[in-house]
UniProtKB/Swiss-Prot annotation:
Domain of life of the organism encoding this protein: Bacteria
Catalysed reactions, as listed in the record: isopentenyl diphosphate + 2 oxidized [2Fe-2S]-[ferredoxin] + H2O = (2E)-4-hydroxy-3-methylbut-2-enyl diphosphate + 2 reduced [2Fe-2S]-[ferredoxin] + 2 H(+); dimethylallyl diphosphate + 2 oxidized [2Fe-2S]-[ferredoxin] + H2O = (2E)-4-hydroxy-3-methylbut-2-enyl diphosphate + 2 reduced [2Fe-2S]-[ferredoxin] + 2 H(+)
EC numbers for this chain: 1.17.7.4
Protein name (record): 4-hydroxy-3-methylbut-2-enyl diphosphate reductase
Gene: ispH
Cofactor note: Binds 1 [4Fe-4S] cluster per subunit.
Molecular-function GO terms, alphabetical: 4 iron, 4 sulfur cluster binding; 4-hydroxy-3-methylbut-2-enyl diphosphate reductase activity; metal ion binding
Amino acid sequence: MQIRLANPRGFCAGVDRAIDIVNRALEVFGPPIHVRHEVVHNRYVVEDLRQRGAVFVEELHEVPDDAIVIFSAHGVSKAVQEEAKRRQLQVFDATCPLVTKVHMEVIRYAREGRESILIGHAGHPEVEGTMGQYDKSYGGDIYLVEDEADVVALTVRDESKLAFVTQTTLSVDDTARVIDALRQRFPAIIGPKREDICYATTNRQDAVRQLALECGLVLVVGSVNSSNSNRLRELAERCGAEAYLIDEPSQIEASWLKGKAAVGVTAGASAPEDLVQQVIATLKNLGGEDAEEIPGREENIRFSMPKALRP
């Protein structure tokens, strides 16, 4: 049985930066360091940081006065930012710069008097943060759509002054269809020159397409609450492969491998490489050959740390 590795896979620049911010804050200030929401959506990473002294909370009222708090890579609403400022909490913002770019877009659209439509998944923290960055005091509103049916049902105030943005971790193909539906329904709508789906999401989806063509089974290393990891599994299935999302190698079932000449392995943008290597070792113990990496797009993007945390 061949083992084929997706390229690229695993950590993206935004995840690297967010984890580095928590680790560096622990080094500089010592524990505890409070983090609003899981800094990235990976159980393995979160547990490792928790053992080092990070305290994960869902809301700021759980953070003591005079504490240090880190905002997760998914971003936060304006209300959360203002609450932290009012309480004079020391904040380090681990929001991915590509998410911040989307925030800047909805802030600008609100000031221009445009209503905004966000393509995204309800309940995801990135979506909640972006929705909360739109300033309704300018008279407009922001609407969430997940699919074409939502576009059909949507009612806005002024179809001539509309803009759209997207969550950064969506399916590229699904998002393209929703954007087409928006343009057909609202011909005057404007949006970013390129959709807001980030480079890492796009690259990992392209790699999975190739993997699914070569392998009857695709294993995606990632946690169930990771949006981009779920999109990778769904895409592999659409491309004709059997696919599973796994948090760790112990979840692999030998029955999945029965009759498979090749198995593909990839990882979501918040899954560490050492988990991938553990999965490969397990597959080899179950009869797999040495892993072979497929050709892919090189990534060399790095995002800078907050000044106060730089060595």
